[in-house]
């Protein structure tokens, strides 16, 4: 797994945030997209950008801005791909297993270092589905103390194997529509006011994350990471508030 870190040697003791890019991009592109947010928080956290393992077509808006930054990558398929694209259940499970192993290795590697390890996750678009699945994971979810969900999409992508993503969704919907307990960690949900996937972002928040522990940051934009200094500072302020809440 290709890994990029924003930290220098002196920052090695800072707690880390695992950064998961959207489909059709990569770690380098997400690092560039999130650079203003990272700049606002680099004194508090290390940001670890990781590449998804599977090649894909470029995502929306990637061309022409990032035409030279290849390959374009994606996370694992969900069960919908079995019917829509004639993908075998075995392939879906194998992809899920590989993503879980990659993320597991990185969490364990950071846990043996001098810092607090990976304490949070920041994700964009398809990466938010993986991030939510990570927080749900019974083995690794407890290490994630807060989440930054940028332009979220739905549903969560489970990291357990074999578990269908519809079953992941059903964790939050009982018989007769009764709701089970949602993720009880602080979260920041960053949403562009013109994002065509806005309803999916709202559904991810409603069904998977505790509203009492969630902060929503709106910005003028579409399906993108906010880049203006004003918007980045608003996100950073919310993140620091979440971090404070997670430690109390």
Curated annotation (Swiss-Prot):
Pathway, per record: Secondary metabolite biosynthesis
Induction: Expression is positively regulated by the fusarielin biosynthesis cluster-specific transcription factor FSL7, probably via its binding at the 5'-CGGNNNCCG-3' motif present in the promoter of all the cluster genes.
One Gene Ontology molecular-function label: hydrolase activity
Any GO BP: secondary metabolite biosynthetic process
Function: Thioesterase; part of the gene cluster that mediates the biosynthesis of fusarielins F, G and H, decaketide compounds with 5 methylations and a decaline core that act as mycoestrogens as they stimulate growth of MCF-7 breast cancer cells. The initial compound in the pathway is produced by the reducing polyketide synthase FSL1. FSL1 lacks an active enoyl reductase (ER) domain and biosynthesis of fusarielins relies on the trans-acting enoyl reductase FSL5, before it is released through hydrolysis catalyzed by the thioesterase FSL2.
GO cellular component: cytoplasm; nucleus
Descriptive protein name: Thioesterase FSL2
Class in the EC hierarchy, top level: hydrolase
Signal peptide (from-to): none
Organism: Gibberella zeae (strain ATCC MYA-4620 / CBS 123657 / FGSC 9075 / NRRL 31084 / PH-1)
Pfam family membership, one: FSH1
């Amino acid at each position: 797994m290709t890994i990029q870190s924003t930290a220098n040697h002196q920052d090695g003791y800072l707690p880390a945030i695992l950064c998961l890019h959207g489909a059709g991009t990569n770690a380098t592109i997400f690092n560039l997209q999130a650079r203003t947010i990272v700049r606002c928080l680099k004194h508090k956290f290390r940001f670890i950008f990781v590449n998804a393992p599977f090649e894909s077509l470029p995502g929306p808006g990637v061309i022409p801005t990032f035409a030279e930054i290849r390959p374009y990558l994606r996370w694992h398929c969900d069960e919908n791909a079995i019917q829509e694209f004639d993908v075998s259940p075995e392939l879906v499970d194998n992809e899920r297993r590989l993503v879980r192993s990659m993320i597991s290795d990185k969490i364990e590697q950071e846990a043996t270092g001098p810092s607090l390890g990976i304490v949070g996750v920041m994700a964009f678009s398809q990466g938010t589905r993986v991030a939510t699945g990570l927080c749900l994971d019974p083995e690794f979810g407890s290490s994630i103390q807060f989440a930054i969900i940028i332009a979220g999409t739905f549903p969560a992508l489970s990291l357990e194997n074999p578990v269908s993503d519809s079953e992941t969704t059903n964790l939050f919907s009982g018989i007769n529509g009764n709701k089970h307990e949602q993720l009880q960690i602080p979260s920041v949900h960053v949403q562009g006011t013109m994002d065509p996937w806005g309803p999916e972002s709202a559904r991810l928040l409603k069904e998977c994350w505790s509203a009492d522990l969630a902060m929503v940051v709106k910005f003028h934009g579409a399906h993108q990471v906010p880049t203006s200094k004003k918007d980045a500072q608003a996100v950073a302020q919310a993140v620091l508030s979440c971090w404070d809440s997670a430690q109390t």
